[in-house]
Amino acid sequence: MGGFTEKQEALVNSSYEAFKANVPQYSVVFYTSILEKAPAAKDLFPFLANGVDPTNPKLIGHAEKLFGLVHDSAAQLRAKGAVVADAALGSLHAQKGVTDPQFVVVKEALLKTVKEAVGDKWSDELSNAWEVAYNELAAALKKAF
């Protein structure tokens, strides 16, 4: 990787704002996408036990936290060239037994959600910026296992 560019960070920042403009709606898109690809994922998220409930504050809060972490990862990549994950968060993912294929499902759901949030502003460049930030966050979480 040739370093996370200023443009990549700007793309993540602007599309993150689009996500934040309607967190409840995009939280539903995000978790619905996860459950469509991996129905067993509901066991990893206690707040999904009864499905995707758009009024569940835990569902909305978790989506907002995840998207915020990826957004913050973009900033870390730009500033420091690396992402450092919270050890407790890495430990939680290890305790839950999160696997590489599950990280991929979450990434795909994240990209689908961002695509919906930005509409016609979606591009390969935008997708790549989010993918790099997410992949680096996932790698940092796995290191913290």
Swiss-Prot record:
A GO-annotated cellular component: nucleus
Domain Globin: residue ranges: 3-145
Xref: SUPFAM superfamilies: Globin-like
Protein keywords: Cytoplasm, Heme, Iron, Metal-binding, Nitration, Nitrogen fixation, Nodulation, Nucleus, Oxygen transport, Transport
Chain positions found as Nitrated tyrosine: 26, 31, 134
One GO MF term: oxygen carrier activity
A biological process term (GO) from this entry: nodulation
Binding-site positions, O2: 62
InterPro entries in the cross-refs: Globin, Globin-like_sf, Globin/Proto, Leghaemoglobin-like, Leghaemoglobin_Fe_BS
Oligomer status and interactors: Monomer.
Family: Belongs to the plant globin family.
Function: Leghemoglobin that reversibly binds oxygen O(2) through a pentacoordinated heme iron. In root nodules, facilitates the diffusion of oxygen to the bacteroids while preventing the bacterial nitrogenase from being inactivated by buffering dioxygen, nitric oxide and carbon monoxide, and promoting the formation of reactive oxygen species (ROS, e.g. H(2)O(2)). This role is essential for symbiotic nitrogen fixation (SNF).
Protein name: Leghemoglobin
Species per Swiss-Prot/TrEMBL record: Psophocarpus tetragonolobus (Winged bean)
